[in-house]
């Protein structure tokens, strides 16, 4: 009887973006929302950023990656994908943890847009003050 193919799941968040990442053993295909990653992210820098956990663990062409990303912008989604891939790799093998931890791949970037306060123009920008 055929065994179901093992898949490893990880969730990443960045700003208001959420990425649900699934890793399966394969040849290195990378799809985001059923589109090729190069077509979705467009920038090579963002693709390199998203795949950083795989390059740290030397597993770039060992896994097929499927991502469901929503919310925020492209840069935030790339950061969310990076965290999701790192978390999924931990489920593949705990041996990857030290390298990913040192590189800061397992830390959720908590920075987000600060809310606008009433009486101000933006979060901190006040109206120009005139003494006279």
From Swiss-Prot:
This is Small ribosomal subunit protein uS9. InterPro entries: Ribosomal_Su5_D2-typ_SF, Ribosomal_uS9, Ribosomal_uS9_bac/plastid, Ribosomal_uS9_CS, Ribsml_uS5_D2-typ_fold_subgr. The keyword Nucleus does not apply. GO terms for cellular component: cytosolic small ribosomal subunit. NCBIfam families: PRK00132.1 (NF001099). The lineage of its organism: Bacteria, Bacillati, Mycoplasmatota, Mycoplasmoidales, Metamycoplasmataceae. GO terms for biological process: translation. Keywords: Ribonucleoprotein, Ribosomal protein. Belongs to the universal ribosomal protein uS9 family. GO terms for molecular function: RNA binding; structural constituent of ribosome. Pfam families: Ribosomal_S9 (PF00380). It comes from the Bacteria. PROSITE patterns: RIBOSOMAL_S9 (PS00360). PANTHER family: RIBOSOMAL PROTEIN S9, SMALL RIBOSOMAL SUBUNIT PROTEIN US9M.
């Amino acid at each position: 009887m055929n065994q179901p193919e093992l898949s490893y799941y990880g969730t990443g968040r960045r700003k208001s973006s959420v990425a649900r990442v699934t890793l399966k053993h394969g040849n290195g295909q990378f799809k985001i929302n059923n589109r090729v990653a190069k077509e979705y992210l467009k920038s090579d820098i963002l693709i390199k950023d998203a795949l950083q956990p795989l390059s740290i663990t030397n597993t770039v062409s060992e896994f097929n990656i499927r991502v469901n990303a929503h919310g925020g912008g492209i840069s935030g989604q790339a950061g969310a994908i990076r965290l999701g891939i790192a978390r999924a790799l931990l489920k593949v093998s705990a041996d990857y943890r030290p390298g990913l931890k040192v590189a800061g791949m397992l830390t959720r970037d908590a920075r987000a847009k600060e809310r606008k306060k009433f009486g101000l123009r933006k979060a901190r920008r006040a109206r120009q003050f005139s003494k006279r």
